[in-house]
Structures are given as C-alpha cells and as structure tokens.
Amino acid sequence: MKGKRSEAITQGFERAPHRALLMGTGIPRKELGKPLIGIATSFTDLIPGHIGMRDLERFIEKGVHTGGGYSFLFGIPGVCDGIAMGHKGMHYSLSTRELIADMVESIAEAHRLDGLVLLTNCDKITPGMLMAAARLDIPCIVVTAGPMLTGTGRGGRRYSFVTDTFEAMARYKAGEINAAELQQCEDRACPGAGSCQGLFTANTMAILTETLGMSLVGCGTALAVSSLKRQIAFASGERIVSLVREGITPRQILTREAFENAIRVDLALGGSSNTVLHLLSIAHEAEVDLPLDLFDKLSRETPQLASMNPGGKHFMEDLDAAGGVPGVLYQLRDQIHDNPTLNGVGVKQIIDSVIDVDETVIHPKEDAVRPEGGIAILTGNLTPDGAVVKQSGVSEKMMTFEGTARCFNSEEEAMQALMGGQVKAGDVVVIRYEGPKGGPGMREMLAPTATLMGLGLGDSVALITDGRFSGGTRGPCVGHVSPEAAVGGPIALVEDGDTIVLDIPSRRLEVKVSDQELAKRRERWQAPEPKIKKGWLSRYASVVTSANTGAVCKAR
C-alpha cells in the first residue's frame, strides 16, 4: 500500500492540530496510522427504506475494525419518492442525487478519508453515492439496505406499495373498493423496513450496483430484515480496508463493459426507466462514454427473463430466493463481459459459482417472458433527442397506439382532469414543462399513471411527458422526452386535438403535424417564466442538462 490519503492529517509535526481534533472524537493515538474509513450513511427514521440502517452501521463498523481500519460515520440526506410524490416535494427528489454526490465528495476530500462504505437504499441516494464514488475514484464499496417484505392478507394475498396504494386510490375514486378496503391497503402495503417490494427504482439500482461490481455478491436482493444483509454489511466493512490496501478504486471496476452488463441485467428484469438517467450520470462521472442509443441496441438483443412487479407477479423476495443477481447473470452468461468486481473475483467466476436457478422466476432465454428487454428508446419529430418507455409494463394492445392529444402544462393540471373524468379512451395525455429545467427537477408522474391504471384506462390511453416515471409505473407511458418543453422542445408545440402516434416496435413517437405548421407554432412559442426563482432548485435549473444525457449538472 502506497502512502495513505489520511497521512495528510495524521503524519508529521505540522499536523499536531489535526491529530488533536481527531483524538477529540475519541480515537486513540495508536489507531491514527490505520486506514481511516468513512461510512456515508443515509439513515433517517422518516422513510421505511432507511429505518434499518442503524443496525447495518454497527455491522459495517465491526467489519472495518476487524479488517484493521478505523471508521467514522457521517450523514447523507435521503428523500422517499413515495412520500414526495404528487406535490411540491417531488421537485426536490432528482436534484438530491447531485447534492448527495457533492456531499460525499466534500466530506471525503475535506477529511482525506482513505476509503468509503456507502450505505444507501432508496431511489436517488444509490446513484448519488455511485456518482460520488466514480468522481472521487478512491476505494469505495456500496451497501444497499435491502427490500421490504410484501404485506400479507387473507387467502395468501400479498400487498405491495404501488399497486395497493396509488392504484387503490383511483379504484376507490371509481367506486370499485370502499373506504375500509382502501384503509386495509394502507395498513398492509408497507409492513416494515426496506425499499418498496417490487422492481421499482431503488431495488433496480441495488441490483445494478451489484451487477456493476460495486457491492458484494448477494447485496442487491438480500432482504432488509435478513441476517444475510447484516453479514454482507460486516463483510463490506472488512473488504473496504482490503480495497484501500490493494489500491482498488471504482474506475477500475466501472468500465464500459461493467455498464453494458448492468444494462443487460436491467433489460432482462424489466427494471425502472429511471435507471437510464442514473447509469448515464454514473458513467459521466466515471468518464465512460455511454450513449443513450446503446440501451436500445442492447434491448433488441436481450430478452426479458422475469415478470417482476409492478408489471408482473414476482417480488424482490421471490427474485432473491430464485438466485438473485448471480442467477440473472447465469441466464445471460453468453452475453456478459468478464469484468472485475469488488469481490476480488471477476463476473465469470461469480457465474461459475451459481448452483441453482429457479427458472419459474428467472426464465432461461429459450423460455423468455418477452423477446426484447424491458426498456426501449423512442425517437421522432416529437422527441428528436430520444425518449424512454418501459415496454415491459405495456400491454401488447398498446405497443402501437394512435390517439388525440390532451395537453397539460403541469402534473397538477393533468391530475385534476383525470380525477374529474375529463380523459377518455383514445386520448394521449401530454404532461409538459416537467423536465429537468422546466419542473424543475423532472418530477415522477406516478400519480397520473397509477390513476390511469386504477380508472381502467391503461389499455386505451397513453401518457407522454418530459418528466419521468416511478419505477412503480406500468402502462403505455413515455418519459424523458427530449428536448424538454422548457427549452422549446417539440413537446411544447403540441396542441389539443393533434394526433400522436406511439409505435414501440418501430421505436417511433411522432405528432402528425407538418414541419411547416410546427415552425409556425415555434415562432409563436415563448419560454415560460421559471416556476421557482430562488434557493437550491433555482440554481439546479440553471446548470442541469437534458434527460438524454442523464440530467447531470455542468458548470455554467
């Protein structure tokens, strides 16, 4: 091991003040020569995905000390997208990804930590942590806190967050369930600690973190309440000290091949469309070229092998029992690169260690759920720079659709129309000025999409937006439309009554309006006033880039 970063604060007579401050925290002098490990914890008792982290912190600390290091905890904020959904709070969710990356960078650099254990779980926290790891390029290992168990009900019914709350709300509005049944859904949907039970954004990112090689084998699917999760936390603490001594850093792991592996696993499972944004942003920090169209190229080659909630019947506990990430890699083995991982072995060795895969959950290729992957990238005159659709959540009937535009300039306007019965079969709901700059913050449209499904319109109405969707979204919903409305993208020029064509097999999203007419509308179009003119979101809107490049922040 070459000279440690922490020697800048622990060695030499001129560092006497630094040592005094460190010993003021309780660290004995004899420990100052050990690798100093930061545990970036996003613990909060405000959200269920993170309430179990106090226990995991202890096991990580034990592992660090067993491995011969000395650990320090520092806090990182965490936002629950479910709680932030459908109101002003959702403006802040995506933007916290950048704050998290900046905060981890700031603490690690200011205190010259030798390595980091990144304790995370929910939607934007995991990509923010990975962005920081790639940017810093110091030894790092990620521990995701794990998924929640499904709720239980009579007759073996299994409850989960999205389908039994957001969609239940719309069913209640439609008179399909009564108030007592709605309350029962509320009571049973979230039985304890962990990220939401389906293949939503948090769990997809945990799986991709393991696939990338940035967490230990099994971490991506090990349940929050399991003893295995604690064992992984301990092993991760022990492993980070070895990574420091071996000089293994994230950019040695986060190669182009690692990202291709992650995309293929994402596609095979039908994961959240948000992963497109996040993988692009992590690759940006790792200085890896990852074009948007690569997702579509790989999707055409990679079959969907699992039917995961929200679009299917299986939950994270099923995937974990079926073989987890190694099981998926095994079924894709002829398409997977042998990339290094933080486990000390390559991906192929992990695949070779697989003993058994439950093929009723993780199908073999010859019995694929769909011939293509879960995500498709669309282009056309409505989205010249690309848009994203989670095709794994779209019914065969809606893979091609032609409908009449109903335009709304905010999520709130769209929800008012949906709940007021103003959206009918054959419509295409257009929600715009919700992009990274225009939102600002590119809000998730889970409430509108869940309402469409709950109202029984999932097979007769499409929704397109320059915003994004929850990992819990299902149905014919196209997001990340780029360029966004706030910068004059074509979605800003669509008018009520226009005909919109959605053709997922052909990867097209178009409005049936001539170029000449669009040019006339562009001449009349005026950029709206910013919705938020002060504070963090105002600054964020001024530096955030388009969704097709990951909505990363760049200097003015």
Swiss-Prot record:
Superkingdom assignment: Bacteria
Catalytic residues in the record: 470
Entries under Pfam families matching the protein: ILV_EDD_C, ILVD_EDD_N
Binding residues for [2Fe-2S] cluster: 122, 196
Family named by the database record: Belongs to the IlvD/Edd family.
NCBIfam families: ilvD, PRK00911.1
Protein name (record): Dihydroxy-acid dehydratase
Native organism: Syntrophotalea carbinolica (strain DSM 2380 / NBRC 103641 / GraBd1) (Pelobacter carbinolicus)
